[in-house]
């Protein structure tokens, strides 16, 4: 899990992902990239459920889909039931850059109070892709990976990131069903 081979970011996967994220604008869109057969990747569009939580308990969940995302935990369970590995967790930043925000980091880590190592990735081995959507159109994307040595999320540099950026900006739009 977490390996981002260039061939796996197919034009079809990128087109479906970008269309879903653009359609979510001006809210944050989200989804999962899953490995389906040991080789191929597919995009699974997910509803951003943060507004439901905010409506029920605004004190505990003060943010809304305009500036935060929450994937229904059942999406992860469904992927596991289908025998799929979640390799990338995707979300967009409406009218903002493709950075991994403090809120993104907090949501991606599982605190372990009193443990020798106080943080652990919530989904070990999964990378995070943040896509900047400005005025409803995908502009750029950056991939982030948990570094075991630094115990922090680091931006993935190199060919994978370049392929993604080029793929996002050159993607032909297609229809996608939820």
Language-model region placement:
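Conserved beta-strand-loop surface patch within small alpha/beta domains used
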Residues: 1-86, 94-178
């Amino acid at each position: 899990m977490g390996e981002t081979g260039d061939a796996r970011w197919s034009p079809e996967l990128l087109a479906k992902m970008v269309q879903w994220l653009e359609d979510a604008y001006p809210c944050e869109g989200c989804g999962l990239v899953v490995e389906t057969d040991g080789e191929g990747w597919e995009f699974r569009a997910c509803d951003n459920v943060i507004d439901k939580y905010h409506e029920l308990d605004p004190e505990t969940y003060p943010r809304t889909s305009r500036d935060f995302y929450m994937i229904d935990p059942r999406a992860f369970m469904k992927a596991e039931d289908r025998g799929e590995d979640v390799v990338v967790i995707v979300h967009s930043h409406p009218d903002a850059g493709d950075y991994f925000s403090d809120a993104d980091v907090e949501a991606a880590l599982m605190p372990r109070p009193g443990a020798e190592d106080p943080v652990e990735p919530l989904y070990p081995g999964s990378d995070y892709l943040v896509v900047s959507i400005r005025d409803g159109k995908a502009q750029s994307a950056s991939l982030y990976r948990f570094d075991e040595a630094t115990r922090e999320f680091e931006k993935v540099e190199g060919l994978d990131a370049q392929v993604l950026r080029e793929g996002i900006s050159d993607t032909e739009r297609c229809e996608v069903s939820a």
